[in-house]
Amino acid sequence: MQRRLIASVLLGHYLSAFTALGIPLYLPRILADLAPDAPGWSIGVLFVLPTLCTALAAPLWGRWADRRGCRLSLLRAHAGLFAGFLLAGFSTNLSMFVLALIIQGTFGGAMAASNAYLATQFKDGDLSRALNWTQYSARLAMISGPILLGLMTAQGLGLELYRYLAWLPLLAFVMILPLPADTPRHQANATNADGPLNPLPTDMPRLLLVQFLFSFAMVVTFPYFVPYGEALGIGNDALIGVLYSLPHLVYLIALPWVQRHASNLLLPGLGLLAVSNALQFWSTQAEPLFALRLLSGAGMLLGFVGLHRCLSQRSRQGSAGRLFGWFDASGKWAGTAAGVTAGLVSQTCGIASPFLVACLAAVAAMALARPLLMTSREIPA
């Protein structure tokens, strides 16, 4: 039953994340068909709009999940994505499309909802590994989504892509329906259903700040990686795409072995991330880039595994929704801030400058993360 449960949650998350993470790359083409007179800056606004809505809504949905049930919240997330994608696919004007993106971001949030539900079914080491696998499904969607959707757009599909892909989160919804429900607060404690919820860990602000800096360090180098590669003399778009994807491929390939390690690898991961970004900032030739991207992937992998171990150690009965809601919101705010920062520093300090910013963010995360490891009890691998 446990294998079936985690397989259903992970596959459901992949199906929902496939469209959410894959289709934004093709927003310029979709917007050109839907609103050809829209200003260029509107692409950036539409790109971050669902993320901003999720960042704002995730803590509220987390609180709702703790009171009403995390499985119900997961069903809500898949249903919200289905509704948002379907409306986007039938949009006839820009206003309707914007509303669809707001619905997608506000009522979606499948990552936080999936992790919160898993936290009601697994504990300690089992939960830590489950969180690693939900991140695995996100990385897989991040790689496969743009490739497969690119093949579809090459056939002339545009806005109607949303219409067809809306059925993926609906399929995820159906897969979650037969899974066991957790015990929501209003059933577990009917005499005080509206009373105060169980408290979050006292060091939660520190954990959220480390998550913010870690996510920021990863994302800030994404937006301008193509012109960065071109500046190093790489003229092949496919090769730039491979180099861009390498860190995610490291996660997909090496996770089964790395997560068996008994100790927390968060600090080494942040250190590798800082070093790799510093070296990419100083690089003037393309030859070392392959090795440096692998090094970035190793840092990303160790960082995620370490963060998930810290998170699983702080998961408590009755607080999973808020814990993972705030954790996901922190990552979403980091992504938004990273996009803005990348645009500013690349225009003022050079196309490689986001890598220096990423290095500094990773170093700051290292300094803040040490107390998290000192206060955490070790959990079995």
Regions found by a protein language model. Name each.
Residues 1-3, 181-211:
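Juxtamembrane intracellular "pre-TM" segments in multi-pass secondary transporters
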Residues 52-56, 240-261:
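Transmembrane alpha-helices of Major Facilitator/SLC transporters
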Residues 319-349:
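A late C-terminal transmembrane helix in Major Facilitator Superfamily
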